[in-house]
Every structure is written in structure tokens, then in C-alpha cells.
């Protein structure tokens, strides 16, 4: 979605030359955020052990046991839960979001970027003015629907027409610690969590 405007003056005299085209600068009223996890290796090790333990009739399995099947990260579901309000309607006349909802969520899948990193998902959000923020929690589920992890609420800083990438150990997260983000940013930023 884009928004733009420009002025043109029309005259009644057909002899006056009018411009063939008019340039309109377009701008997105949206900001994009994306989560990238950097603990894929640890997650695969943990899941291999869990799967081997489950296959052995819930006997304890050590990390040296051979898993019954290879772990395919694309088999896992990622669910993003918006905590609080999520803007979902935009007015072109006021150039601002005009409505928001609670209880919004969306699903994604893990997409491997490297041996240790995977994209968890992304979304576009209408931004009021120049800067804003949304708060999300991220849940990881196996193909049977079992929740494997859930993050604490994470505040995502947003800036209109920019892409914010948040990087951290999200696959192994438990809802116990917090993630903090510096909201003073300019342009596209890749935020790395230790």
C-alpha cells in the first residue's frame, strides 16, 4: 500500500499546454518488522533429543543418542501474538491508523537462512506519524501442536517505510526473561540480542 498526493491546476483554455505527466511521491504508511533467530543448531539438538526420547517410550535420551528422524525446521509452526493493540485500519485523508484490534495473531514457518540462523516471520503494521511500536510474543509449535517455547512480550520499534530486523535466540526462549530494544533508531536497524 502506498499513499501520495500532488497538486495540478487545470484551466478552461484548451490552447494552453498541460503537462503530459505529473510526478507523485509515494510513501508507505506501513513499517515492516522481521524476527531472525540465531539458535537453530541448539534447537535442532534439543529437538533431536526430545524426538529420540519420545520414540524410546519416554525413556531418558542423552544428546549422544541417534534421533529417529532428522529435524526439519520447516515442520515447526511459529505463531506471533500481538500483545495489546494492533493497528489494522488506515485513513488516507488523515494519513494515520484509525482503528486497532486486540487478540491479533498470525502464523509463519521457519525459513533457514544459514546453518545457525532462520527467519521466523515478518509483518507490516500501519504507523501513526513517523514512529510507533507494537508488542509481540512468539510461540514455537511442533507438527502435533505442542508448544515448545514462548517468549516474553517483545516491544518492536517501528518507523514508517523502514524494515526493522530483530535477531536473537528466540527458538529456545522460555517466558521468563525479557528482551529490551533501544527505540532510538534512524533508518533500518538490525538489532542483536545476546
Where are these regions (language model features)?
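Intrinsic-disorder/low-complexity, polar/charged segments enriched in Ser/Thr/Lys/Arg/Asp/Glu/Gln
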Residues: 21, 32, 119-121, 163-165
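Generic marker of "main functional regions" within proteins
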Residues: 34-36, 45-47, 88-90, 166-168, ...
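Short, low-hydrophobicity acidic/polar segments
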Residues: 1-42
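Generic structural signal for short, solvent-exposed loop/turn connectors between secondary structure elements
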Residues: 15-21, 116, 151-155, 173-176
Amino acid at each position: 500500500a502506498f499513499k501520495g498526493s500532488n497538486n495540478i491546476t487545470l484551466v478552461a483554455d484548451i490552447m494552453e499546454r498541460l503537462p503530459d505527466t505529473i510526478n507523485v511521491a509515494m510513501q508507505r504508511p506501513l513499517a515492516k518488522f522481521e524476527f531472525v533467530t540465531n539458535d537453530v543448531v541448539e534447537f535442532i539438538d534439543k529437538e533431536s533429543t526430545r524426538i529420540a526420547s519420545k520414540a524410546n517410550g519416554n525413556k531418558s535420551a542423552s544428546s549422544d543418542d541417534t534421533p529417529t528422524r532428522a529435524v526439519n525446521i520447516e515442520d515447526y509452526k511459529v505463531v506471533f501474538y500481538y500483545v495489546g493493540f494492533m493497528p489494522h485500519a488506515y485513513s488516507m485523508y488523515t494519513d494515520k491508523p484509525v482503528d486497532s484490534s486486540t487478540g491479533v495473531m498470525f502464523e509463519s514457518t521457519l525459513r533457514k537462512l544459514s546453518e545457525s540462523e532462520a527467519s521466523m516471520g515478518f509483518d507490516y503494521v500501519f504507523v501513526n506519524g513517523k514512529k510507533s511500536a507494537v508488542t509481540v510474543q512468539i510461540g514455537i509449535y511442533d507438527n502435533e501442536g505442542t508448544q515448545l517455547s514462548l517468549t516474553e512480550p517483545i516491544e518492536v520499534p517501528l518507523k514508517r517505510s523502514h524494515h526493522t530486523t530483530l535477531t536473537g535466540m528466540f527458538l529456545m526462549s522460555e517466558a521468563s526473561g525479557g528482551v529490551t530494544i533501544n527505540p532510538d533508531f534512524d533508518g533500518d536497524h538490525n538489532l542483536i540480542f545476546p
